[in-house]
Design a protein with these regions (language model features):
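N-terminal, post-signal-peptide region of Sec/Tat-exported proteins
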Residues: 49-86, 422, 428-435, 439-451
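CBM-like carbohydrate-recognition segments
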Residues: 22-57, 66-79, 85-105, 109, ...
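Long, well-ordered core segments of solenoidal/helical folds
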Residues: 22-43, 77-95, 126-145, 178-207, ...
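Short, surface-exposed patches at the edges or C-terminal ends of soluble domains, predominantly
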Residues: 393-485
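Solvent-exposed loop/turn segments at secondary-structure junctions
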Residues: 66, 85-86, 241, 284, ...
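Bacterial Sec-dependent N-terminal signal peptides
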Residues: 1-22
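Inter-helical turn/loop segments and adjacent helix faces that build the functional surface
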Residues: 171-182, 241-253, 306-314
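Oxyanion-binding "anion nests"
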Residues: 235-284, 288
């Protein structure tokens, strides 16, 4: 008990002092975003017109991770106000049209799931389920890949994997849809199979199954270039999906192999002088090409997160460190108002549409590069969160913290009637604070685990800490387990 108490004091002290230090770069850019973007949704002045958009979701995902890291309620309040602008009490979403079958519209569903898990308010579940319903009807290629949009028939874009699959995975995990995981894995497998260039290992921005688009190679259906942000979307999608993907699923290894091939290719086109990446990844010597902030932030974020979660070896963190240093030196600027701004993000790049975007190098170079584009800002906040996690001291590195699920074995049914372990469990995001406790523990380098059987010398031999919280009685559990030794 004494050893446990001392370690807990050290863990919480480390976390307190980490939070009390000078404001982090993630927090500085988040403060700028909250003060200047989408003001009408959070009651500020000088509102900007807005719509239900993935751009906002990218920023909110960065703010969500910052909230988890700091437990600062300001971040949660901002997330909730941002979504409450759109979500009615009956779960409808303002400006959202499911019949558009636009996969971009799915991304904010991840924030809706968080809000539901924290507050229990049904409107967030209903809104998230609307988005899940869209995926059930989303048009597909012949083999089953999601079309990017209804107005872009037969096309898969790298972007679309980030827009749809992490939400699809989180929803399937939470609401017991095990059959979805094959479908989710196949989206990445098919995208790589069609878009990967064998010579460089890089992935083309888009693939047209019909080969009818002007931008499509008549033999392969691929677009002409390797656009940096598109590959950034794809890498972030892979890592975010793997975070919630079943550990025992047979296709998990396929996804990790795709991730490693992808990052190995990305490493080769990292600019050796700055650590950054070009807008068109493999053409650094083209005069019009430029180092681009959002792609660089995405590669930094996804690679660092993959290392944190154990999907890539620790040696890959060097890629992220070099890239992050480059971003701070080249793209982060403080203005006269004290805002911390991100320069150097291309506002948009796409394929087809009106006016028609032909996927040529000249087209990509024609799009505007702007300050504080939400896609870049959101990716940077996420990247900074990851790099700040890696920079913190890891007092308990490599040790295992086991939580009891035998003496405290309460069960509850979710909204779909599926029974799950309940009350002081690691995933819980509501007021008991256990998800935050778990984050404090993992932020200090430990691993968390759960023991669902009676403790023995054998099943505790690898654990540094074993914790029992609120053991059951018959009021909690009709068949409680009691200690007999």
């Amino acid at each position: 008990m004494k050893k446990f108490s001392i370690l807990c004091i050290v863990l919480f002290a480390n976390s307190y002092f980490a939070f009390a230090q000078t404001e982090s770069m993630a927090a500085k850019v988040a403060a700028t975003a909250m003060a200047t973007l989408w003001k009408e949704q959070v009651g500020a002045d000088t509102a900007k017109p807005t719509k239900w958009t993935y751009d906002q979701g990218v920023v909110l995902l960065g703010i969500e991770r910052l909230w988890i890291q700091t437990a600062n309620p300001v971040y949660f309040s901002y997330m909730q106000k941002s979504m409450d602008y759109f979500v009615s009490e009956n779960g409808d979403i303002k400006f959202y049209k499911a019949q558009d079958y636009n996969i971009d519209n799915i991304l904010c569903g991840r924030i809706l799931l968080t809000l539901y898990n924290v507050t229990g308010q049904l409107k967030y579940y209903k809104a998230a389920s609307l988005l899940r319903g869209q995926l059930k009807g989303q048009p597909r290629t012949k083999e089953g890949g999601f079309w990017h949009k209804k107005v872009y028939p037969y096309q898969m874009w790298l972007d679309g994997l980030y827009m749809g699959q992490p939400f699809y995975t989180a929803y399937a995990k939470q609401f017991n849809e095990p059959e979805a995981f094959d479908d989710i894995a196949n989206q990445f497998i098919w995208m790589e199979a069609h878009a990967r260039d064998a010579k460089t290992g890089l992935l083309y921005h888009g693939w047209d199954e019909s080969k009818e688009q002007k931008w499509a190679n008549p033999l392969t259906g691929c677009s002409p270039h390797f656009w940096g942000r598109a590959m950034g979307w794809y890498e972030m999608a892979l890592v975010d999906v793997l975070e919630n993907f079943p550990a025992t699923h047979p296709k998990r290894a396929d996804l990790i192999a795709i991730l490693k091939r992808l990052v190995d290719a990305i490493k080769k086109v990292q600019d050796p002088a700055t650590g950054l990446w070009y807008d068109i990844l493999n053409l650094p010597n083209e005069k019009a090409n430029y180092l681009e902030a959002s792609a660089s932030a995405m590669f930094v974020c996804a690679t660092a997160k993959a290392v944190r979660l154990g999907f890539l070896p620790a040696s890959y963190l060097a890629v992220s460190k070099k890239g992050y240093d480059g971003i701070l030196k080249r793209f982060i600027k403080t203005d006269e108002k004290g805002y911390t701004n991100l320069e150097g993000t291309v506002s948009v790049s796409g394929l087809g549409g009106k006016p028609y975007r032909d996927g040529s190098f000249a087209y990509y170079m024609s799009e505007k590069v702007i300050v504080n584009d939400p896609k870049g800002v959101g990716a940077f906040i996420q990247a900074a969160n990851e790099m700040e996690w890696h920079a913190a001291a890891k007092t308990g590195k490599g040790q295992l913290f086991l939580l009891d699920d035998y003496y405290n074995a309460e069960k509850k049914k979710d909204i779909k009637g599926i029974e799950y372990a309940y009350h002081y469990k690691w995933p819980e995001m509501y007021n008991n604070g256990f998800s935050f406790l778990g984050n404090v523990i993992t932020s200090n380098g430990l691993r968390t685990g759960t023991l669902s059987e009676a403790p023995t010398a054998n099943n505790l031999k690898n654990a540094a800490i074993y914790m029992i919280v609120d053991a059951d009685n018959v009021a909690d559990n009709p068949t409680p387990n009691y200690m007999n030794e």
